[in-house]
Amino acid sequence: MRLATAAPLPAPAWAARVIWYQIFPERFRNGDPSNDPTRDSLEDPANVPQNWRITPWTGDWYSRDAWETAQDKPGSPDKVPNFYKNGVLDRRYGGDLQGVLEKLDYLHDLGVNAIYFNPIFYARSLHKYDSSNLQHIDPYMGPDPKGDLELIANEDENPATWHWTSADRLFLKLVAAAHRKGFHVLIDGVFNHTGRDFFAFRDLKAKQQASHYKDWYVVNSWAKPSDPASKFTYKGWWGHDTLPVFAANADNTDLAAGPKQYVLDVTKRWLRPVVDGKPAQGIDGWRLDAADERPAKFWTEWNAYVRSLKPDAYTCGETWKPAARFVADDGFSACMNYFAFAFPVKGFLIDARIPASRFVMLLDSRRKAFSPSVVPVLQNLVDSHDTDRLASMIVNRRLAAYPPDGDISYDENNDVRNNNTYDIRKPDAGDRAIQRIVVLFQMTYLGAPVVYYGDEAGMWGAHDPDCRMPMVWKDLKFDPQATDPRGIGRSPDDLNFDAHLFAFYKSAIAFRKAHAVLADGPVEFLNPNDSNRTLAMLRRGDSEEIVLAINRGDQPRVIHLSSPHLEWTDPQIAISTDGSRHTLARDSDGWDINLPPLTAAVCQGMIPVLPRNHGPP
């Protein structure tokens, strides 16, 4: 297929008005125990004990089942490698599509209106970034795994061989149900690498240079029957041999022809599905894993193809680097906004290790590097499946090692496996106060907020795999979290659903949705005070102005609100992180608000209907 490379279309308008909710499917909700994964479905079942079983959803996370401890080697010097190497990655909890269907009302009640799914395609790992194919939803997320596996056994890259499995159909049912409730749906596209069980790689490994797929992967050396010493070796993503990398074309400007056509066919299948001869509702866009590791030409053509299929589709590239040029050159709608949002938030609001003025400078300079049309649709996340959870970042805020050059410490050794001093405890009241500040800032800043599943329910956890614990639910009673992977004593923690934190998330989300200025209005920071760790942020619309005041310090502070563009009348406190109705006092050139330590409040006021100077973007 020859693709045109047109100028990228503007990002869809809907993407500026959503609050994303990220779901890690295997850990969200087990709605159908009859389809639970089996030992044979695991990545390397021969190395998993016969007494393997589904892990109880509500158990103590660091407590290990008998099949896990059976793998421990006698005389191991410590217990940390045993927990992380022997068992936890082979755990399955049974999260599935039926579970998501059952909890759409929960998400609707929370107020989020867009769902981003981590990979849901057929794969053997728990995370599913090691796809076995991309044309099918994982059979163990649907109602008939055995039947689905039989149906797809002889498929190849030709779409004419592809069926619609029961899991595929259930996913499309979920998409339609989500659309009826006002959600947009984004799925993870892993087009950089596959798993070793991927149909093309299995054929390549078996047939070597005689394989039809010999040009699909980066092969370093072939196994030759005439040379018993020869070995089949290939490039794995970041050295992981479980994730063989798709090859580029000869001049490294594009994806190789074979995998490229396959990716295009998969893209069309899920954006514009036709089932039993009838069009069905498809997804609303893609999040692209490791997007900055593929040539720009491929993404430019792929993004143009996506828009030709669905003009209002949203595409979001994963990158942790400065991303403005990447988004513009490759044609994406946006990116996961680690560099321009999560990093500064970690530095000031969470760790309090950079001054307020630098926080403002980083946010302003990194935001303004993007096209103004891109900024409102950036995915403003703080944590994800690839980091420790927000709550645990806060618990461990004093551990962050900030280098002399002033760079921000983000996702570095944030787990027990690599940092023996990492604290796995439940957040306390002070930690939750900081979490509420972060959330209120996220919900009032420019860009689309992202909530990682369970953060709103009180979940905490270190870096992968500890950030991927089973979701806590109101109707489930969790065991006390009483085990420490280091084999030391621990005070039991209550992991059950946090209704108070949920209520705060819900109110902050509702406030954002109720005020259009928060989705597209300009941003102006007011009076950052480095010694007090205070600042304010002004968002201006045609009829109202909203100011967020933040005291990140450990003392009560009066925060002065003044700007040539602040023209409101009769401002009121709309929402605060401590639930108090703080008062605003007028002075000669603005307003004062007195905030306790670790508190933020949103002030809202109407403005005169007069010609106005809108100020900076």
Provide a role label for each language-model segment:
Residues A16, D32-I54, A123-P143, F191-G236, ...:
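Aromatic- and acidic-residue-enriched segments that line the glycan-binding/catalytic groove
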Residues F24-R27, I115-H127, G189-F198, D289-R294, ...:
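Short, solvent-exposed turn/loop segments enriched in Gly/Ser/Thr/Pro and often Arg
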Residues M1-F183, Q261, K268, L598:
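N-terminal structural segment of carbohydrate-active enzymes
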Residues I19, A585-P617:
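C-terminal beta-strand-rich structural cap/linker in extracellular carbohydrate-active enzymes
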Residues A15, N30-K85, V360-W568:
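Loop/helix patches that line or flank the sugar-binding groove of alpha-linked glycan CAZymes
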Residues I23, L107, F117, L134, ...:
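Conserved, mostly hydrophobic/aromatic
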Residues V175-F183, N192-H193, F201-Q208, V266, ...:
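Active-site-proximal helices and loops of the catalytic beta/alpha 8
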Residues S563-G579:
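Solvent-exposed beta-hairpin/edge-strand motifs
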